[in-house]
Amino acid sequence: MNIQIVTVGKLKEKYLVQGIAEYLKRLSAYAKVTIVEVPDEKAPEVLSDAEMKQVKDKEGARILAKIPDDAYVIALAIDGKMKSSEEFAADLDKLATYGKSKVTFVIGGSLGLSEAVLKRSNERISFGRLTLPHQLMRLVLVEQVYRAFRIVRGEPYHK
């Protein structure tokens, strides 16, 4: 399985870079996982609704340019479906079983995802109702993908 994670912004925090690198190393036994960063749109702290939409649209265009046409796209969104780790694992396994070998996860910037990206997505998932920094979400996602592969193969880790 080829898994791509498209995310907005450059990761600067060393502890997150190290954590993600560790999980990517572990994941290499199960899948090819790549992380693609697109530039975030510079914006002032306080934005009108129209300005927020404009920022999300610009970031969204950059995201969409990185998604392969044949990819199954999963957007991480606060309004997405919440799943247990076991459900997430089963769903990833089903994608592989039914020939969806290219899966792209999308993590938006601090303002979220554009409507165009959400429309391109095949599904939306949420890792809870908490708001997490999008940089931290990368680490959470790669850990959950790793956990999913361990669960599917019946390997110890997830308890």
From Swiss-Prot:
<dbReference type="GO" id="GO:0005737">
    <property type="term" value="C:cytoplasm"/>
</dbReference>
<comment type="function">
    <text>Specifically methylates the pseudouridine at position 1915 (m3Psi1915) in 23S rRNA.</text>
</comment>
<feature type="binding site">
    <location>
        <position position="108"/>
    </location>
    <ligand>
        <name>S-adenosyl-L-methionine</name>
    </ligand>
</feature>
<dbReference type="GO" id="GO:0070038">
    <property type="term" value="F:rRNA (pseudouridine-N3-)-methyltransferase activity"/>
</dbReference>
<dbReference type="InterPro" id="IPR003742">
    <property type="entry name" value="RlmH-like"/>
</dbReference>
<feature type="binding site">
    <location>
        <begin position="127"/>
        <end position="132"/>
    </location>
    <ligand>
        <name>S-adenosyl-L-methionine</name>
    </ligand>
</feature>
<comment type="similarity">
    <text>Belongs to the RNA methyltransferase RlmH family.</text>
</comment>
<dbReference type="InterPro" id="IPR029026">
    <property type="entry name" value="tRNA_m1G_MTases_N"/>
</dbReference>
<dbReference type="InterPro" id="IPR029028">
    <property type="entry name" value="Alpha/beta_knot_MTases"/>
</dbReference>
<keyword id="KW-0698">rRNA processing</keyword>
<keyword id="KW-0808">Transferase</keyword>
<protein>
    <recommendedName>
        <fullName>Ribosomal RNA large subunit methyltransferase H</fullName>
        <ecNumber>2.1.1.177</ecNumber>
    </recommendedName>
</protein>
<dbReference type="Pfam" id="PF02590">
    <property type="entry name" value="SPOUT_MTase"/>
</dbReference>
<keyword id="KW-0963">Cytoplasm</keyword>
<feature type="binding site">
    <location>
        <position position="76"/>
    </location>
    <ligand>
        <name>S-adenosyl-L-methionine</name>
    </ligand>
</feature>
<comment type="subunit">
    <text>Homodimer.</text>
</comment>
<keyword id="KW-0489">Methyltransferase</keyword>
<keyword id="KW-0949">S-adenosyl-L-methionine</keyword>
